[in-house]
Regions:
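Conserved Rossmann-like nucleotide-cofactor binding loop
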Residues: 18, 42, 208
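Central helical "cap/lid" subdomain
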Residues: 195-232
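Glycine-rich FAD pyrophosphate-binding loop
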Residues: 27-48
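Beta1/beta-strand and adjacent pyrophosphate-binding region of the FAD-binding site
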Residues: 4-18, 35
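A conserved short coil-to-beta-strand element within the FAD-binding core of flavoproteins
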Residues: 125, 173-187
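Dinucleotide-binding Rossmann-like beta1-alpha1 core, especially the glycine-rich loop
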Residues: 52-130
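Core beta-strand elements of the Rossmann-like FAD/NAD(P) dinucleotide-binding domain
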Residues: 5-8, 190-200
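Helix-loop-beta segment of a Rossmann-like dinucleotide-binding subdomain
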Residues: 4-7, 85-94, 108, 115, ...
Length: 232
């Protein structure tokens, strides 16, 4: 049994795909004295019912770059950490019903080409070669993304967690953070098992992120602009 730590360089609050990705990448870049706290089981929050779509399409350079990196990571992660993971590269065809939409696709394609992605503008006459049942009478064209696909979010989370553990990161499940305080230049994360002093705190609490964010407002933090709603 691992003793509960009292210090760390970074404490991550939240054990979904964002939290485990943060821990994995911190460890990969040498910040191995990092800890993840999860109030329940890994993926028990918003991650377990995520759709798992893996597009590279975006009109934002930064988001496209992040998605490109993610797709590259997913291709080799299962083998790297020795954890089975359902990741399917299926390709996708996005449809344009106007010339303005085609201009948006052309801009996206240009950004993608610069970042090394093989996005392709499709003429209407060529689109049925990809999807023969497509109705094309009202289309202006399309954008084909051969790298689009889907992934199992729970398996991805567990793979990232395993990779982080392999590099020395620590994960504590069923250990909710219950508050934070500040002592000098350090943060103190409070849990029922004890307090952890650290340099940095990462709020990866998913649909609890707004609630966790409120803890930081007395120290200059801002409200996380989100609301949690129940649905079927």
């Amino acid at each position: 049994m691992v003793d509960f730590p009292t210090t760390a360089r970074v404490v991550i609050i939240g054990g979904g795909v964002v939290g485990t990705s943060a821990l994995y990448h911190l460890c990969k870049f040498g910040w191995k004295d990092s800890i993840l706290l999860e109030k329940n089981e890994l993926t028990a929050g918003s991650t377990w019912h995520a759709a798992g779509n893996c597009p590279s399409f975006s009109t934002s350079w930064a988001i496209m770059n992040m998605q490109r990196y993610s797709l590259e990571l997913y291709r080799g992660l299962a083998e790297e950490v020795d954890y089975p993971m359902n990741y399917h590269v299926t390709g996708s065809l996005r449809l344009a019903h106007s010339r303005n939409r085609m201009k948006e696709f052309e801009r996206c394609r240009s950004m993608g080409k610069y970042q090394g992605m093989d996005l392709d503008i499709m003429q209407v006459s060529d689109m049925k070669d990809i999807y023969p049942f497509l109705e094309t009478h009202d289309l202006a064209g399309g954008l084909y993304d051969p790298d689009d696909g889907d992934i199992d979010p729970a398996q991805l989370t567990q793979a990232l967690a395993k990779g982080a553990r392999n590099m020395g990161g620590k994960i504590f499940r069923f250990t909710p953070a219950i508050g934070i305080s500040r002592e000098g230049d350090e943060w103190v994360v409070h849990t029922e098992k004890g307090n952890i002093r650290c340099e940095k705190v990462v709020n990866a609490a998913g649909y609890y992120a707004q609630r966790v964010g409120e803890w930081f407002k007395p120290f200059g933090g801002r409200t996380v602009p989100m609301v949690t709603m129940s649905h079927q």
